[in-house]
Design a protein with these regions (language model features):
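A short mid-domain helix/strand-loop element embedded in enzyme catalytic domains
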Residues: 159, 173-226
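Conserved kinase catalytic-core segment
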Residues: 55, 60, 68, 142, ...
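Generic structural hydrophobic/aromatic packing signal, biased to beta-strands
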Residues: 38, 45, 77, 90, ...
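Acidic surface patches and DE-rich sequence motifs
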Residues: 38, 198, 261
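Short alpha-helical "patches" and their helix-cap loops
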Residues: 77-84, 252-262, 408-412
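C-terminal catalytic region of ATP-dependent kinase domains
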Residues: 125, 129, 133-145, 151, ...
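Conserved ATP-binding subdomain of kinase catalytic cores across diverse folds
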Residues: 3-146, 150-189, 193-194
Length: 415
């Protein structure tokens, strides 16, 4: 659609007039028609904020180019306009033989189809213990033989009611290892939390690496899908790291998903999409302040003043923090990136720490310039200087911050 690029943006109205874009009412999202699929759901147009001096469209396209540099899969983005409003177009993250399941849908389905069943099993198990006036496995073994048999029959029935897949059913008392089953039911207490899908400041409490991973494993089990464990975990942590590097603070559970291959039943993490909340380019005041602070730091020579200006810039940059956390308590406590980085470094294997270091090593002034050149070459339009400066400041700040924390972990000194 290069023939309808105007002022750096794909002109959607011109593309429609020339027959390059077709869409129908079913593909439209929202009453204002500011978000719609076109060309048989292969591309989407999305209007960005037009009321403030923000640059969400550049956040999307810079993150797309950055993801390529870091070898992280991401949806393709380009600048676009529709009805005089600026926006972006993005290619679908799925092919014809694939299905996208958003994180919210996945987490809720796992909760309803698995966690609730296990919670019900535990409550029923406690009632069964009361019925037989026992509390422990040892007390069970002291029951009269007939009571032990009836207890096992009832427990087998309760367990089967909690199973999603028929192949997990216990069909005969001879199949029961009562010690294992008794302890399994006992240990369900607190294992599947009631607040798994509760919201905290708009974020589902399970929107964290640990719970996402657990939910995907369970989803595969109850749905019969196949999971490449290492590949999925790598992609999941790459998403988390990408958000830390870019200050992506809007990775709620509708802004990530899984892709199911209908032919092979293999599940993978969807390519990254919707990065309009990255690089602070959606925050008007932050854009102005980061740009101003960075310019003042270049000319200020007085140490006390430099320290004060840097502290203000640091506070502004760190105001945004990752939507995806590591553990549920990180979500509930609304922990910011410094704590998340510390936990990630502490709890990650050496392999994942090295992977983090490799990605950080690619964030250089030269590579950032290369990203800007790639975008300007594609759009035939200069990127606003303020966008370049703010994006560069955030990327380099986060790179240096994470590297410093890695150095401390290894017993070295900060930069």
């Amino acid at each position: 659609m290069e023939q309808v690029r105007r002022n750096g943006m794909i002109d959607i109205n011109a593309a429609i007039e020339q027959g390059l874009i077709q869409y129908n009412e079913a593909e439209v999202h929202g009453a204002r028609k500011n978000k719609f699929w076109f060309n048989n759901y292969t591309w989407m147009y999305k209007e960005v904020d037009n009321d403030y001096n923000t640059y969400e469209e550049y956040a999307e396209i810079i993150c797309y180019e950055l993801s390529k540099l870091l070898s992280i899969r991401s949806a393709e983005y380009d600048l676009a306009s529709f009805n005089g409003k600026k926006g972006v177009i993005t290619r679908s993250v799925i092919n014809d033989n694939e299905k996208l399941i958003h994180g919210t849908e996945l987490l809720n389905e796992v909760y309803e189809d698995y966690f609730v069943l296990k919670q019900t099993l535990h409550k029923s198990f406690k009632n069964l213990l009361e019925q037989y006036n026992i509390k422990t496995l040892e007390e069970f073994h002291k029951l009269p033989e007939q009571d032990k048999i009836s207890f096992q029959e009832k427990l087998m029935k309760l367990y089967n009611q909690s199973c999603v897949n028929p192949e997990d059913f216990i069909n005969d008392l001879d199949e029961i290892n009562i010690n294992d089953l008794f302890n399994y039911c006992l240990e369900l207490d607190g294992l599947y939390p009631d607040n798994f899908v509760d919201m905290k400041n708009g974020i589902i409490s399970s929107n964290n690496l640990y719970d996402i991973w657990s939910a995907v494993e369970i989803y595969c089990k109850i749905s019969g899908y196949t999971l490449d464990t290492k590949s999925f975990m790598t992609d999941l942590t790459d998403m988390f790291v990408f958000d830390l590097i870019t200050n992506q603070g809007d990775r709620h559970a509708d802004n990530w998903g899984i892709v199911i291959d209908r032919d092979t039943n293999i599940i993978k993490l969807a390519s990254l999409y919707d990065n309009s909340g990255a690089l602070s380019l959606n925050r008007e005041k932050a854009i102005v302040n980061i740009d101003d602070f960075s310019k003042r730091l270049k000319i200020e020579k007085r140490p006390a003043k430099v320290k004060g200006i840097y502290a203000k810039m640091k506070e502004t940059i760190e105001h945004s923090f990752s939507g995806v956390k590591i553990y549920a308590e990180d979500v509930l406590e609304r922990r910011k990136n410094t704590k998340l980085i510390e936990t990630y470094i502490s709890d990650s294997s050496e392999e994942f720490q090295e992977r983090l270091e490799e990605k950080l090593s690619l964030i250089t002034d030269e590579n950032i310039d290369m990203i800007f050149c790639e975008i300007e070459s594609k759009t035939h339009q200069p990127i606003p200087d303020v966008v370049k400066n703010v994006a560069r400041q955030i990327l380099m700040f986060n790179k240096n911050k994470i590297n410093d924390m890695l150095s401390v972990k290894k017993g070295g000194e900060k930069r």
